[in-house]
Amino acid sequence: MGCAPSIHVSQSGVIYCRDSDESNSPRQTSSVSQGPTAPLHGLFVQTDAADAMPPSRAAGPPGAVRVRRSRAELGSGSSTGSSGPATTTCRGRRRHCCSSAEAETQTSYTSVKVLLIFAKEDSQSDGFWWACDRAGYRCNIARTPESALECFLDKHHEIIVIDHRQSRNFDAEAVCRSIRATNPSEHTVILAVVSQASDDHEEASVLPLLHAGFNRRFMENSSIIACYNELIQIEHGEVRSQFKLRACNSVFTALDHCHEAIEITSDDHVIQYVNPAFERMMGYHKGELLGKELADLPKSDKNRADLLDTINTCIKKGKEWQGVYYARRKSGDSIQQHVKITPVIGQGGKIRHFVSLKKLCCTTDSNKQIHRIHRDSGDNSQTEPHSFRHKSRRKESIDVKSISSRGSDAPSLQNRRYPSMARIHSMTIEAPITKVINIINAAQENSPVTVAEALDRVLEILRTTELYSPQLGTKDEDPHTSDLVGGLMTDGLRRLSGNEYVFTKNVHHSHSHLSMPITINDVPPSIAQLLDNEESWDFNIFELEAVTHKRPLVYLGLKVFSRFGVCEFLNCTETTLRAWLQVIEANYHSSNAYHNSTHAADVLHATAFFLGKERVKGSLDQLDEVAALIAATVHDVDHPGRTNSFLCNAGSELAVLYNDTAVLESHHTALAFQLTVKDTKCNIFKNIDRNHYRTLRQAIIDMVLATEMTKHFEHVNKFVNSINKPLAAESEGSDCECNPTGKNFPENQILIKRMMIKCADVANPCRPLDLCIEWAGRISEEYFAQTDEEKRQGLPVVMPVFDRNTCSIPKSQISFIDYFITDMFDAWDAFAHLPALMQHLADNYKHWKTLDDLKCKTLRLPSDS
């Protein structure tokens, strides 16, 4: 790339080799070049030549082959020159490619990374270093067990070479075990370098090495070619096999998320694998199927008597079979499937497995309608059953060719116009809503006038942008409801010139002398006793707030994150987690009456409680759980104690930055990631790979943005229509098997996570009465303070009823529960089964209703205060 690499030695003793960020020189500064190397997986790989060499090795080993390169070989920007240090290299090399047939089955990866763990430099470590250099591997050297583990967790090497010749510097087997205890080591090959056995001693057994986690043993030999041969054998043997195993993990992940039912059997028809879609379709759990013969499962009596013999005759010849087959579900129902069975040739050129793909043959009403329209309109291209069954995936749309040909008798014009019209049609029908509109338009053609007019009205509604949001004006003219809707569901009313509200955060740190815990085991006994009850919904967060001096988030976070194995998933230490929780909590404003770290801890507690419910747990994987807990922790970080509407009306810096759209929610997520990644001491994401990080980050952002109230009804209605209604139909024994619930589909997992954090965020009315009353007082005080400031600054008062002199808190709570809470928690309860919460909600509503009937505007009756 034209840059000179630099060598960095960390404080922990790892020699890190990387390209220099400071050099922009296009010149080649190395006096040592590399020859051709062995192929790796048949892919072109460019490396930076083991990152770099230690200074002592820069001149090359004795007898090293030096190859001069032409400008063409080095590239136009990498000519040899005299500038730059003469002992550093920046080389790229290319590997030859395998056949296209093999390449199609491979997964790409960068050059092999090797970690050498030697306490001191000697001829053996030199031999492996130069062998790595010759092979084009990226190489690091670690001198201590601690630095070795740190380096491995950072770079995830494919090969690790550990010096096992002497034990006075470190215990090689202990080092190996510590590496094997980490998740990234699953596909790593670890090589032990052992001393040559003397002639009078019997050669030692390799079993202790294997038990410690080593894969291979290498007899001490400092010859570069011996080390090179060993590494090349490992690359072409174990490393390549490990990459195939990694690819298998990806394949099985794809199978688990595939919408088609997949069944894999052995050559004697013993079931060896079924995916979740198969379980949903057939009603069995895979534990009931694995290891059973297909002949032992119940059969449907709707198939032809000779169908099974026909299928077996076909597939035993190595031919693929596909057709319609009736299967019997666990419930006893017969379902019609389109089945495709493929024999898999394995060892010895014989059939070793059969892979079956199964789809339900269920024609929806819309498909029937389209089929009828095609038939009635005389479109003969779709009249053959076979053609109809195997036509384009866009079968739910009207054929463009038949439409365009109706009004024209000029074939040449039609032929010229058809390709462009088809392209336009293919662009517009991809969106699901467009498919729906096309189906309705087709249905109108043969419908009575009254039905056609009704469908016109349906089309008008479908063409609006807010399909899931209710018409707010249809609600009763209750001022409390109107103010809540205006204050929480709009991003601002109007901008008043000259009234710029500059948002400045004021972080309040507690000055108590309560020492922070290093781990969950170091929590003071008084706090630990409170946290013993944190799994209960009735957990009192205010007691934790008091005993922790308004720092409940760190302590509850340590306990909850430990319970869900967050550190293990993120591959970080509890010290890093504690530092992160401290930073996040420090950026909550303790001066806020409501939006402070106690509210964040309360939302974290509710989220953890929901994650423990059986159906929620069964719908999400561990990444979802970790993302939900992190999102709950950061969802209101740096909240100013003012609503989005206030910030937009005041022209705050944040409102300008985020274009008056989801201002606070966008700020919470952005700041949370900024705080996390700017300091490695609190960066809980530093040890996860890029793909996991991006997936986790996207999930966290999506959940925090879901707490914005402007899309409240959209999220709730999508959840009801996509999750609750299919579940209800399933429980009622619906005959339609076309659309299984699919709670584990990614799009449905997103809806579940959004609904979960939304409910956790506003769960105060579902808490025990004393807690509910305290939260009501706090949120009212925060709204009162906002109204006071709006009046002082001459800003629009977005919630006039929250005037501390006239407000009825019971009325505001009743309106909030009626408008936002009841329907949402009814839907969430139908999914997660939360009878205790719903009872609290009913009791609390009764409390507020009693106060309102008595014309009491306070939190409690005066006699109860």
Swiss-Prot record:
Keyword Metal-binding: yes
Main EC class the enzyme belongs to: hydrolase
UniProt modified residues of type Phosphoserine: 497, 731, 734
Tissue expression from the record: Widely expressed.
Gene Ontology molecular-function annotations: 3',5'-cyclic-AMP phosphodiesterase activity; metal ion binding
Biological or metabolic pathway of the protein: Purine metabolism; 3',5'-cyclic AMP degradation; AMP from 3',5'-cyclic AMP: step 1/1
Domain PDEase positions: 519-855
InterPro entries, sorted: HD/PDEase_dom, PAS, PAS-like_dom_sf, PDEase, PDEase_catalytic_dom, PDEase_catalytic_dom_sf, PDEase_CS, PDEase_PDE8
Job description of the protein: Hydrolyzes the second messenger cAMP, which is a key regulator of many important physiological processes. May be involved in specific signaling in the thyroid gland.
Domain notes: Composed of a C-terminal catalytic domain containing two putative divalent metal sites and an N-terminal regulatory domain.
The protein, known as: High affinity cAMP-specific and IBMX-insensitive 3',5'-cyclic phosphodiesterase 8B
Organism: Mus musculus
